[in-house]
Amino acid sequence: MWSLSYGIFIVSSCFEGKANGQIANTVFQISAEPARVAVAINKENYTHQFIEKSRMFSVTVLDDETPMKLIGVFGFRTGKDVDKFEGVETIEGDFGCPVVTEHAVSVFEAKVFDSVDVGTHTLFVADVVNGKMLTDKPPLTYAQYHANKGKAPEKAPTYRGAAGEKAPTYTGVEPPNAPTYRGPETGK
């Protein structure tokens, strides 16, 4: 699982005059026509409540020069205790919510039309209602972030826990022509 490629994004939403945002690595395009995306948000994250109630969100695609300070504001603090948007470059989106433009490659807003409970997370499926490219800088990937910036927070899907890297456990199902893997106990 650790070799899957991810981006690093700020997903934001607002409800009843209050806004919140968070770092997310699971944002992906579903279709081009109509323009549809999905985001996976941990149910325990404050942003989840905002998206669930408002049925909308914005996404900021961060550039590969994004400082750890900005990632830290949206990734390691709760909006219950602090206004994450204070001192951060934003524009007001069509939904009336702040959209982060600081270190943004692009931004877009989306309206949720479906959601799927996937255990610890909800997958919000949405139609993109607007978007804008802001620069041609390359986007920040999770691999770059992990190599250069630090470790995933505990609620992130890519969190590895205190034990560090763990080998996947054997499921008994192997694809054809795959090398045999029996788990860490056999060393193979």
Q: Could you tell me what each predicted segment is?
A:
Residues M1-K188:
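Basic, polyanion-binding surface patches
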